[in-house]
């Protein structure tokens, strides 16, 4: 966050000029600043543990932090790579617990898997279509509109959060198979 706020992207997806010219974008993990927002994007690493199971600790910790500050009608978009169903089965209950709000009544969720492959200069955030989804059709439209403003080559709206989560897993599997052969 500190690096991005001084317009430095260690993944080299964005140059200084692009980051400095983005007027609506703010990077922060300060809870006072976060309380002012109505849309949150959670994108944290989701490594696998020694047993090759997803380690969701960072994701759930970030979700808990956001759960403590969300308000009615807020939107939380997840980007971390997870298994199909994780957002609604693992993250939503944490948001409900810490916010005391009800999912799809008081707050809403979206999922749009990150598509950045650090170091890949061919398939960058600027030229890879972004998959989007939402917890309700009207929420999916909002999530899609947010990313349409950012992703030049466009978006693809998935019919559900679970389908968008599965698309990311399929993409990773295909990449791994291509590398293996």
Language model regions located:
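Structural/interface elements that position substrates and couple domains in central-metabolism enzymes
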Residues: 1-181
């Amino acid at each position: 966050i500190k690096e991005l706020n001084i317009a430095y992207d260690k993944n080299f997806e964005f140059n200084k000029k692009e980051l400095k010219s983005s007027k609506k974008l703010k990077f922060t993990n300060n809870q006072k600043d976060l309380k002012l927002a109505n849309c949150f994007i959670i994108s944290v690493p989701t490594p696998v543990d020694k047993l090759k199971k997803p380690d969701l600790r960072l994701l759930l910790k970030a979700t808990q932090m956001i759960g403590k500050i969300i308000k009615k009608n807020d939107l939380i978009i997840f980007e971390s790579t997870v298994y199909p169903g994780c957002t609604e089965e693992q993250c939503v209950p944490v948001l409900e617990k810490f916010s005391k709000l009800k999912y799809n009544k008081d707050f809403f969720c979206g999922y749009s898997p990150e598509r950045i492959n650090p170091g890949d200069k061919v398939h960058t955030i600027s030229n890879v279509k972004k998959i989007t989804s939402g917890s309700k059709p009207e929420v999916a439209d909002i999530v899609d509109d947010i990313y349409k403003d950012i992703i030049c080559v466009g978006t693809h709206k998935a019919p559900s959060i679970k389908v968008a989560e599965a698309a990311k897993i399929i993409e990773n599997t295909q990449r791994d198979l291509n590398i293996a052969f």
